[in-house]
């Protein structure tokens, strides 16, 4: 039961860290390459 409590307490923390890193990465990509969702050569 101790391992279940440990897992439930660390998984949300790891998910929050991962989503924060991913959001920062997407923000920086959009800063250097704006409007990447639009295909300009079509």
From Swiss-Prot:
UniProt keyword annotations, A-Z: Chloroplast, Membrane, Photosynthesis, Photosystem I, Plastid, Thylakoid, Transmembrane, Transmembrane helix
Cellular component GO terms held in the UniProt record: chloroplast thylakoid membrane; photosystem I
Superkingdom, taxonomy of origin: Eukaryota
Ranges annotated as spanning the membrane: 7-27
UniProt KW Iron keyword: no
Membrane topology, record value: Single-pass membrane protein
Keyword Membrane recorded: yes
GO biological process: photosynthesis
Compartments reported by the entry: Plastid, Chloroplast thylakoid membrane
InterPro entries linked to this entry: PSI_PsaJ, PSI_PsaJ_sf
Pfam families, sorted: PSI_PsaJ (PF01701)
HAMAP family hit by this protein: PSI_PsaJ (MF_00522)
Family per record: Belongs to the PsaJ family.
Annotated function: May help in the organization of the PsaE and PsaF subunits.
Protein name: Photosystem I reaction center subunit IX
Phylogenetic placement of the source organism: Eukaryota, Viridiplantae, Streptophyta, Zygnematophyceae, Zygnematophycidae
